[in-house]
């Protein structure tokens, strides 16, 4: 699977761009603020419905324009698909797939599985549990057909339960919500546990290659006491939840922890080592998807050289080449990505939102 063409209109500082892309490595070179990260963000937005640097639509729409428009062509294993997304300043989205409107953003995500590696991506390791839940949920979304519907319903019921907690006086008034919520919560938790167990060996193998000096352990925490039934716990915790005004325990508190010698990796590893670990997690997840479903991820790597010395850059470059996936890499100069440049690569020069193809001779 590869994105063969990308059209960008009024996104960030890019007025208009029409890019013919290659299945291997696509390099974006330019000074800071030139717009190279905006290209990566446009691809990410086409696959997620939102940008990775801002959740507000108005901030990614070019100045004085009413909306941004993105189009892409995806070369799949059997057919070519056409996808499109537009969003106005009020946040209203339109999704088009193969010429027809009325589709959902989740359908774009299924067609364009994307792994993102950015300088801000350390939050996967040193940020709150929500970032690691998102990591697990990405895998469950692409591996369990019923996951997204169950997850969406669970989130809706959690919101309704939290609102009800601020109005009810005894647990019986919540029972109707919990009878719906508990089966979904347990199913989501089981899917996450199964996925984390299934991918652990892939992560460990990649980490052994990237960080052989560390022995890492992985553990999934479902968000409530493993000895307790969730239905019983919710009833037992009612008074506490009512005082708090929200549900304190459940799958919305789940986490996926990584340790070395019993210590959290964020407290032991250097920033360069943490970046390699982050890359290992993203690569392992993408390779697991390929093995399970035959789908290849798109890898978006912003500021490739950040935190990595030349040895580590070569290591990451070789591993990315081995995936045979489509890779988009941004860098300030061509020298920073010389370890990646090969016969299957295409280089773009980005200057003040203008994108041109650059010869690699």
Swiss-Prot record:
ATP binds at residues 30-37. GO terms for molecular function: ATP binding; single-stranded DNA binding. Its main location: cytoplasm. One of its GO terms (biological process) is DNA synthesis involved in DNA repair. The lineage of its organism: Bacteria, Pseudomonadati, Pseudomonadota, Gammaproteobacteria, Enterobacterales. Disulfide bonds: none annotated. Keywords: ATP-binding, Cytoplasm, DNA damage, DNA repair, DNA replication, DNA-binding, Nucleotide-binding, SOS response. It is found in: Cytoplasm. Signal peptide: none annotated. Belongs to the RecF family. This is DNA replication and repair protein RecF. GO terms for cellular component: cytoplasm. The RecF protein is involved in DNA metabolism; it is required for DNA replication and normal SOS inducibility. RecF binds preferentially to single-stranded, linear DNA. It also seems to bind ATP. PROSITE patterns: RECF_1 (PS00617), RECF_2 (PS00618). NCBIfam families: recf (TIGR00611). It comes from Pectobacterium atrosepticum (strain SCRI 1043 / ATCC BAA-672).
